[in-house]
Amino acid sequence: MNNKFPDLKNKNIIITGGNGFFGKQITNAFYDQGSNVFILDTKKSRERKRITFFKTDITKEFDLKKVLIFFKKKKIKIDVLINSAAKDHVPRENYRNKEKFELENFSEKVWKEDLNVGLTGSYLSTKIFGTYMAEKKNGVILNISSDLGIVAPNQSIYKKTNFIKPVSYSVVKHGIIGLTKYTASYWAKKNVRCNAIAPSGIYNKQNANFLKNIKKVIPIGRMAKKNEYNDLILFLCSKASSYMTGSVIVSDGGRTII
């Protein structure tokens, strides 16, 4: 156990999308601090001591209320909510752009699915669990936005990958920043802080052409390592950031400055 943030020990952390690629990194980061982690996801995971799984569709208020009932019945305080769940379309080797992500052909069905998980799900989770925090007059909400919530996608990095970054992802991540600022202002007097991070992409064996191209638009010259955001996330959920709310911290290797 690496206790960089000792005040997070025994704190109760809800992570939506905790079984996703990024969600797993967040889960492990809090677990290593001695926190009690509660994962909300549609994908089942193995439970361990201090890790509890709820099969939850965060786009359904009823599902979220069932989780809240669990906390209330057990008289468990919610210390931190991490809104990490989102749908992301990424280039893969030999990818065939069957879903037609070009704006001219982008389907309403995929648009609604992406916004429902990434934005509506974050709003509903904030509404349900944030209200509980506000009643207790204590809590932290951290939203996961993206560098593409700051700037538009540079479609040139997808050249030769037969892929285009869809409009829905950027809209969701911009919306997350708006949700963050609204929530921070709304519950400030209730001692509920809300911040966001805007990370860049994490290396995960992406398409070779994509990797070659994206390095050209990141001043540091590489994608993030999978655990490189851990300390930033922990900091924003700890007492060390007690005077921060409504902040959006960009951690992108310099991508958004050029």
Residue ranges and their predicted role:
Residues 188-193, 244-246:
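Short, small/polar-rich loop/turn modules that mediate ligand/substrate recognition or access, typified
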Residues 84-99, 254:
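Conserved NAD(P)H cofactor-binding loop of Rossmann-fold oxidoreductase domains
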Residues 218-229, 240:
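A conserved structural motif in NAD(P)-dependent oxidoreductases
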Residues 2, 160, 234, 245-258:
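Short C-terminal tail/terminal secondary-structure segment
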Residues 108, 113-135, 148-149, 184-185, ...:
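Amphipathic alpha-helical dimer-interface segment in Rossmann-like NAD(P)H-dependent oxidoreductases
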Residues 87, 99-124, 138, 142, ...:
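Catalytic Tyr-X3-Lys loop
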Residues 102-108, 142-175, 180-189, 202:
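Catalytic loop of short-chain dehydrogenase/reductase
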